[in-house]
Regions:
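PRPP-dependent phosphoribosyltransferase catalytic core
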Residues: 2-9, 114-198
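A structural signal for isolated positions on well-ordered beta-strands in alpha/beta enzyme cores
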Residues: 40, 64, 97, 125-127
Length: 198
């Protein structure tokens, strides 16, 4: 099945992910990844930085960021993923766990794995927090398979006109599915006054 990335009209339902859900998914992935004994974790940014960092802490493994994306400044600008930050040369000869947030088409993971294989890693495995059904055959490890619209705790809000508001991409996705925009879907964060600011 061919599926357009970011086509939110084809999502079925809504799945808010809490910070507790995120932590539990990362724990499950870390336990599975421990059997592989990764020497390095490569986190695909931006979304993969969150799970990659927690999984690296759980496994007490070194982590390195890479940027392979269709997006620049949160806007889709490329038809195919483009390398913005390559993996480090020190991956050569190492067992690498590549971590991303989601597998949609699978193209980003495939391009990244091809690059690591070309860099002569000893072995590479992939892990994602989530996959849609049409991409589930790509990652080695998946925390959750769903075709729902996923609301991550780290990207559902953005600063707009000096205020924290729903991210515009989610607002559009809600509209495409006919889902009402409700404050209950926002992150119930504690409000802080800064101790110091410039």
């Amino acid at each position: 099945m061919t599926q357009e990335s970011y086509d939110y009209a084809n999502r079925h339902g809504l799945r808010p992910i809490s910070w507790n859900d995120f932590h539990g998914l990362c724990q499950a992935i870390a336990l599975a990844a421990a059997e592989f004994k990764p020497e390095i974790i490569i986190a695909l940014g931006r979304g993969g930085f969150y799970p990659g960092t927690l999984i690296a802490h759980l496994l007490r493994t070194e982590i390195y960021p890479v940027r392979l994306s269709r997006r620049v400044n949160d806007v889709v600008v490329y038809d195919d993923p483009v390398w913005l930050l390559d993996p480090p040369a020190l991956v050569q000869g190492k067992r690498v766990l590549m971590v991303d947030e989601i597998c949609d088409s699978g193209q980003t993971l495939q391009v990244a794995v091809e690059k690591l294989v070309a860099m002569e890693v000893a072995a590479v495995k992939t892990a994602v927090l989530y996959s849609h059904t049409w991409g589930a055959n790509i990652p080695d490890t998946i925390g959750l398979i769903t075709d729902a619209l996923l609301l991550n705790p780290w990207d559902r809000e953005a600063v707009v006109d000096g205020r924290i508001q729903f991210h515009s991409e989610y607002v559009s996705a809600f509209a495409q599915q006919g889902i009402p925009l409700e404050d209950t879907l926002r992150i119930p964060a504690t409000k802080f006054e800064l101790a110091k600011r410039p």
